[in-house]
Amino acid sequence: MARIDLNALPEPMREVMAAYADPASLTRRSLAVVTPPLDHNRPQEQAAEMPATNGICTARALARFYAALIGEVDGHRILTAETLAAATAEQARGMDRILRVPVRIGTGFGLPTPDAFWYSPTAFGFPGRGGSLGFADPATGLAFGYVMNRVEEG
């Protein structure tokens, strides 16, 4: 396994990587529960149904999903405006004890913190493994999806 120079990482990333390296930390105990670690590039693991992980799609499909949450796409809307308002109402905020970053959480979606590049008071969405991101902003009508071709560690 390649060693990572923690000093070369930005401070927030350095902290989470140091916590992950500590077998006694809550971060390590929470994220290293699968042995051997999953390889999200293997078709067998992509076919498995695992909550909160392995949502596999194209960037266009992810953006269209978020667009259908905030309005009609091809005549279909997934959530009513009332349900969306309830799902995006802030329920909690604070420091994530696992990832060691500030978070805001709605009933059904993540909410951006003010330092997130996609921040808007009305935006909602979730980052994903490896740097993927899906979000929407009902106030502007923007829906966005970014995914990678492969999941790479580090």
Where are these regions (language model features)?
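Catalytic loop of the DD-peptidase/beta-lactamase superfamily, centered on the K-T-G motif
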Residues: 1-154
